[in-house]
Swiss-Prot record:
The gene is rpmI. GO terms for molecular function: structural constituent of ribosome. The lineage of its organism: Bacteria, Pseudomonadati, Pseudomonadota, Alphaproteobacteria, Hyphomicrobiales. This is Large ribosomal subunit protein bL35. InterPro entries: Ribosomal_bL35, Ribosomal_bL35-like, Ribosomal_bL35_CS, Ribosomal_bL35_sf. NCBIfam families: rpmI_bact. One of its GO terms (biological process) is translation. Keywords: Ribonucleoprotein, Ribosomal protein. Belongs to the bacterial ribosomal protein bL35 family. SUPFAM superfamilies: L35p-like. GO terms for cellular component: cytosolic large ribosomal subunit. PANTHER family: 54S RIBOSOMAL PROTEIN BL35M (PTHR33343), LARGE RIBOSOMAL SUBUNIT PROTEIN BL35M (PTHR33343:SF1). It comes from Allorhizobium ampelinum (strain ATCC BAA-846 / DSM 112012 / S4) (Agrobacterium vitis (strain S4)).
């Protein structure tokens, strides 16, 4: 059976660290920021580490061969 292909959309959105954690950009920052608190905007900057269960799903289903 051939190897499963990596999803191109996931390549752009996720990064796997050396320890196996999955990094992703914070959600909810596209529009409507005027009503958000400054704390939310500050904390949503940069990347976030996905929860362990979500990270495993991403790796298994979308990034089977890593990046």
């Amino acid at each position: 059976m051939p190897k499963m292909k990596t999803k191109s959309s996931a390549k752009k959105r996720f990064k796997i660290t050396a320890s196996g954690k999955v990094l992703a950009a914070a959600a909810g920052k596209r529009h409507g920021m005027i009503k958000r608190s400054n704390k939310f905007i500050r904390n949503a900057r940069g990347t976030m580490v996905l929860a362990e269960a979500d990270g495993k799903k991403v790796i298994k289903n979308y990034l089977p061969n890593g990046l």
